[in-house]
């Protein structure tokens, strides 16, 4: 089994893990847009890829998978997940399975507001969340919300 780890970056430990598990039954291929990726040192094969949002990224990966008989693709970077998920069928057409959730699930996980609504709509406890700072200030002013509060961007950390 040949495995391609995308956006491998500094995750050399993941490359080592897959090499150990695969043993002699396949190769670990890695790609990253930065040629200084430390993980390149540990892979069986390495390639510099276009950036994730580059229009050539998916065609590049599909062609690479086809040429190297890649069986599965696993991304090691959350930003890559949605891009790969939207193109799963194209990879399957060349015999490659992308190990990734469905796009709608990734969209919920990547968006704190969608995550909050999903949790609330499905009966889970979730901290109050607001889209606008004005809403928070108004709630504090009328005593419906008090400090401490946590303010985070909708996307990212």
Predicted features along the sequence, with ranges:
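ATP-binding N-terminal substructure of ATP-dependent carboxylate-amine bond-forming enzymes
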Residues: 1-99
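Active-site nucleotide/adenylate-binding loops and adjacent lid/helix of ATP-dependent enzymes
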Residues: 106-157
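Short beta-strands and strand-loop turn motifs
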Residues: 98-101, 152-153
């Amino acid at each position: 089994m040949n495995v391609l780890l995308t956006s491998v970056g500094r995750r050399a430990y993941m490359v080592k893990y897959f090499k150990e598990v695969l043993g002699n039954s396949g190769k670990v291929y890695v790609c990253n847009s930065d040629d200084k990726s430390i993980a390149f040192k540990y892979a069986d094969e390495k390639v510099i890829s276009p950036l994730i949002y580059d229009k050539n990224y998916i065609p590049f990966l599909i062609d690479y998978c086809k040429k190297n008989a890649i069986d599965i693709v696993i991304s090691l970077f959350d930003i890559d997940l949605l891009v790969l998920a939207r193109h799963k069928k194209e990879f399957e057409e060349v015999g490659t399975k992308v190990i990734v959730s469905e796009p709608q699930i990734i969209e919920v996980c990547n968006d704190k507001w969608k995550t909050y609504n999903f949790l609330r709509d499905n009966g889970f406890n979730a901290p109050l969340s607001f889209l606008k700072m004005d809403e928070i200030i108004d709630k504090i002013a009328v005593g419906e919300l008090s400090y401490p509060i946590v303010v985070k961007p909708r996307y990212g950390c």
